[in-house]
Amino acid sequence: MNDSQDTNQDPASLYQLGERYNKGEGVSQDHQEAFKLFKISAEQGYSEAQSSLGIMYAEGIGVKKNYIEAIKWFISSAKQKNSSGEYYLGTMYASGFGVDENLQEAIKWYKLSGGEGNIKAQYELGEAYLKGKGVLQDYEEAVKWYLLAANEGDMKSQAKLGYIY
């Protein structure tokens, strides 16, 4: 596929093709090609591609690690209520990568993501409430979030519930 064809394609199709290259499904794994496809799709406003592009920048997959670019793409994705973008934006605030560490801001994004069913965010909220990180310690609230994730098969949340009880 050449660049002129890439830019004229549907952003969802570009994203799906990028996922195939990223995972090596039906094609040889090629992170740089995945990055290129995600970027074209993301620039067209496709929130899943924006989140995936943010992950690639944050982890240095197919591109040089760049937390500032990662944050930019996570914000673009999160503004469209993409639960993955919200989760990863929360993670950046929790870790202080690319932004000042801000646990309250991380919790805000985790709640948005977790409320939309993101299991990773639900687990992180369970952890936050269990340990009192960024929120007041609240075992009932911790159990609530762990249960949401555990009911979707999250083994870490299931283990935490076993620990609590």
Predicted regions and their residues:
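Short helix-capping/linker turns of helical repeat alpha-solenoids
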Residues: 8-10, 23-25, 30, 43-46, ...
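TPR-adjacent "capping" and linker segments in tetratricopeptide-repeat scaffold/adaptor proteins
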Residues: 1-12
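Hydrophobic face of amphipathic alpha-helices that form TPR/SEL1-like repeat modules
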Residues: 14-23, 27, 37, 52-59, ...
